[in-house]
Regions:
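Acetyl-CoA-dependent GNAT
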Residues: 1-39
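A conserved beta-turn-beta hairpin within the catalytic core of GNAT-like acetyltransferases
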Residues: 35-45, 102
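Hydrophobic adenine-recognition pocket in adenosine-nucleotide-binding enzymes
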Residues: 48-50, 83
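Conserved acetyl-CoA-binding loop-helix of GNAT-fold acetyltransferases
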Residues: 50, 56-69, 96
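Conserved GNAT acetyl-CoA-binding A-motif
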Residues: 71-83
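Short beta-strand-to-coil "C-cap" segments at the C-terminal boundary of structured domains/repeats
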Residues: 106-110
Length: 110
């Protein structure tokens, strides 16, 4: 059997940053990916981060909402988010945006 490799240029990324007084208060990344199964891209939400001084002020929610808006604007047919934590409160946080636990992620650090 022979294996062929095809280089695909079908990935792009958008960093959404919340800025307060010229400083980054929080961020989230949206990666847009295309595969051969769908005409539209899908979104991958990663690295939602809020500086400690801005915790419990709704900034994380605003960042996720901005990512969802951008994913829709980019024509994504779905949005996937992952987390290193499986805390119940984190599942609740994402569920309020319609992001529900779906399957299992497998990972190998390289």
């Amino acid at each position: 059997m022979e294996f062929k490799k095809e280089k695909k240029d079908n990935v792009s990324g958008i960093k959404i940053v919340a800025v307060e007084n010229g400083q980054e208060a929080g961020r989230a990344f949206l990666y847009l990916l295309k595969n051969d199964l769908h005409q539209e891209p899908f979104g991958f939400l990663e690295d939602v981060f809020v500086e400690a001084e801005y915790h419990k002020q709704g900034l994380g929610s605003q960042l996720v909402e901005k990512v969802i808006e951008e994913a829709k604007a980019q024509g994504c047919y779905k949005l996937i988010a992952t987390s290193r934590s499986s805390k119940p409160e984190l599942e609740k946080f994402y569920a309020k945006f319609g992001l529900n636990v779906w399957g299992v992620e497998f990972r190998k650090d390289l």
